[in-house]
């Protein structure tokens, strides 16, 4: 909706709106736009080339190093990124995107980019033109399988804070990524308002931007919000009025962990319309976030690939992880599955 101009439309009707303009939302809406923007404003990112036809893209596969990364240019529900170990896999990815149109119009153009080594982290902030309030750091798990293997998904779980983003790295991301992005968008005539999510790869103390999202991430939002003690609504209102300096962030010092409960088959064709059963757990430090569910005849039914995010707080990440899986086990439906290692990078 943001890429389609929802924020612009609401503001044109005099409605207070928290969210970037159609022009600014291109940071997420087009990977080619975002990569070109990174280069223009000196924001560190992987080397890349973009293509709008199959044959030219396929010819480029002869000159890239493997593994390489093939990305659908547009919005693809978090599934448009394919890591390819060799030329055959990359060629198949291009065929799926261009010829089979797996991602529809999002695949009218592709970006082929260098594969980056390192550890990913999510850096989410509220931005209002030239002002910024960083939120708690987090790390998600995109691959469907334990140990980060298998197909990419929208995210199978997340935890907060992310130990890899220490104080030095936090400042480095602000200085090298967020500040240049804010200033660059102002320079482009599209000052930013809303959540700005930078997915970064960190390796040997250096960073590169993988992607931008113009929204809270899912499933990072759930563990982050479980730790936020100050008002999210007030934060958004201050951003709309360009008064972020008045906001005082307050965070729970505990760690949080969120585990996605998914439907059998996800991230490909998945089982749906299954009745969900719950065992009651009463705890202020746990929260079951619904995602792919509907209510039919007073019964909760599954309706999506990612169905719930079981999220919990703990004195440390291990305790938060244990509590989150306790909550996972209180939910059951036919075909339910989850990764059993969410948070492992932060516990190692």
Model features per residue range: what roles?
Residues 1-29, 42-51:
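A short, GP-enriched loop/loop-strand-helix hinge that lies immediately N-terminal to
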Residues 17-20, 47-50, 68-72, 83, ...:
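General beta-strand structural signal in soluble alpha/beta enzymes
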Residues 26-32, 145-146:
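Short, charged, surface-exposed secondary-structure boundary motifs
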Residues 80-221:
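Internal nucleotide-binding/catalytic subdomain
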Residues 174-196, 213-285, 296:
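Active-site "cap" helix and flanking loop/linker of ATP-utilizing ligase/carboxylase catalytic domains
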Residues 293-297, 302-348:
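Generic C-terminus detector
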